[in-house]
Swiss-Prot record:
Xref: Pfam families: Bac_export_1
Gene this protein is translated from: fliR
Protein's name according to its UniProt entry: Flagellar biosynthetic protein FliR
Subcellular location: Cell membrane; Bacterial flagellum basal body
Family affiliation: Belongs to the FliR/MopE/SpaR family.
NCBIfam families, alphabetized: fliR
UniProt keywords, alphabetically: Bacterial flagellum, Cell membrane, Membrane, Transmembrane, Transmembrane helix
Cellular compartments per GO CC: bacterial-type flagellum basal body; plasma membrane
Function of the protein: Role in flagellar biosynthesis.
Tree of life domain: Bacteria
Membrane-crossing segments per the record: 13-33, 44-64, 65-85, 98-118, 131-151, 153-173, 177-197, 213-233, 235-255
Source organism: Pectobacterium carotovorum subsp. carotovorum
Bilayer topology: Multi-pass membrane protein
Amino acid sequence: MLTFNSWDMVNWVSQFFWPFVRILALISTAPVFNERAIGNRVKIGLGVLITLLVAPYLPLNTTPIFSVAGVWLLIQQILIGVTLGLSMQLAFAAIRHAGELIGLQMGLAFATFFDPTGGPNMQVVARFLNILAILLFLTFDGHLWMISLLADSFYTLPISANPIISHAFLALARAGGLIFINGLMLALPIITLLLTINLALGMLNRVAPQLSIFVVGFPITLTVGIMTLGLLLPLIPPFAEHLFSEVFDLLADILTQLSSS
């Protein structure tokens, strides 16, 4: 006859609770999963489903939930999940940054897209590129790679109360440069072209002062910007694929550094 006491119950809950915390922290911060259009019940349900698939294969952790070690372990799992989720946001932030730079040069900085779901307002070009990045992320199975990396993190960085103080978080802070480098690389062709047009319009204004540069300049820069953005669209998928791959390599490096601390 099987016996089931309170201690077995605590061990069983702990076996599923700690992975659930890390998984839910990632879902709350990772791109696509953290969209406000996805309800909290769906996010929690997805977290429970992934936990049920992952937790049975993990080593047993007997750390009491209501203890000092349990509080530290809770904070640790939240930090790991948030680190993984925010690291993946770097790729989308780079693409949004490129959209803001392009919109600024096109004269569309005033055109802000209102998000009815309560998310942050963005410029029109930045919003368009962000939606395109989400579609490409799903097309490249980025969400599946992210879940796979999360599952591997339980083996690379097991659930334990050991300290994780490391320079890995400093590496994450330095990785913020990816936003500016990749964003500028994506927007640089359009920025260069529009800057050349603005210089030409400035010289034209010096030659013919009676020409209203504000009336002529805005339609020209807007039209050329839209046409150039259309020509740039076929180059965005390989750029986004390289960017996502770079961020996933960064995540793997951060997990390795955390596990070696």
